Regions:
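N-terminal and secondary-structure boundary signal
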Residues: 1-294
Length: 294
């Protein structure tokens, strides 16, 4: 296991990240606190994509190890029980974008552990579109937020923050200013205070794209990882940093996206949803770390 704190200089390196800082003003460049204020776990497995029939089991183990480290427990189920009670009604907010959806084995791994905690199957729903009309999500007492990591035309990256846009009745109204108002969705009654876990699925992330609904396999790579945390802003900050470093490695520069992922910083500074300063995020790395990049 390796622990390190990513520096702000790492994150702000390159034109796109500099644009994020400029868009948000000088406040984010102030003196950082001495101690990390958020913890994020990156876990990778060299075999997770190699054997489709064993993928769910590997992902269950990856989630178990990540949560033990994240929450400081000796046993995985102890960690899961810190997040969810058997009496909870749980909505798993997934993402079904057809070109790069949340993998079914990952959804299955999450559901398996919810059942193991004692949540009854009738009180679990995995959904993306239609959550406003979904009876489980309507009465949910706990949410798990999971989505694939990719660039995004309107938001810079497909973030955990962005994944809740289906809770908004008028989704297109959140597109202006690089989706700056996404954090407000997390204040809605169906969402506020309910999210127990955020997972950026970095098994096969897309690190570059331009234009709406862009997808190109040239810009997808088998990273074979999960980025996990209870703080959605911190998880997204690490995820955005990973995509930035990959673009720099691939192109020889941090090639600009349609918009910088500035909504992540807004979610911190305006909506107070978490930590967007990399100098205040403790990143713990587990598992296979060849070409980890961060």
């Amino acid at each position: 296991m390796e622990e390190r704190v990513i520096t702000r200089r790492d994150f702000l390196r390159g034109a796109a990240a500099t644009a994020v800082a400029a868009a948000m003003g000088p406040g984010i460049l102030g003196e950082a606190q001495a101690q990390p204020a958020a913890k994020v776990v990156l876990i990778r497995n060299a075999d997770v994509l190699a054997q489709p029939d064993k993928m769910q089991g590997i992902l269950e183990s990856m989630l178990d190890e990540a949560l033990k480290t994240l929450l400081g427990t000796s046993e995985p189920m102890e960690a899961w029980r810190k997040l969810v009670k058997s009496s909870d009604v749980v909505g798993v907010k997934s993402n079904e974008w057809p070109k790069l959806p949340t993998p079914k084995p990952l959804e299955g791994a999450i559901k398996r552990r919810l059942l193991d905690v004692g949540v009854v199957e009738q009180n679990i729903s995995i959904a993306d579109r239609g959550v406003l009309e979904n009876p489980i999500f309507q009465k949910a007492t706990a949410l798990v937020n999971v989505r694939p990591l990719r660039t995004h035309h309107w938001a810079g990256i497909g973030s955990c923050l962005k994944n809740y846009i289906q809770y908004a009745p008028n989704r297109s109204s959140f597109h202006p200013e690089a989706c700056a108002a996404l954090g407000s969705i997390w204040k809605l009654p169906m969402v506020e205070g309910k999210t127990r876990l955020n997972i950026q699925c970095a098994l096969t992330p897309q690190f570059y794209g331009r234009g709406a609904n862009f997808f190109d396999t040239r810009y997808v790579w088998p990273y074979q990882g999960l980025i996990v945390g209870t703080d959605p802003v911190a998880v997204d900050t690490v995820a955005a940093h990973l995509l930035q470093v990959k673009r720099t490695a691939f192109f020889g520069e941090d090639r600009a996206l349609d918009v910088p992922p500035s909504h992540i910083i807004v979610a911190d500074k305006k909506y107070h949803l978490g930590v967007s300063d990399l100098n205040r995020i403790q990143l713990v790395k587990l598992g296979w770390m060849e070409d980890a990049l961060i």
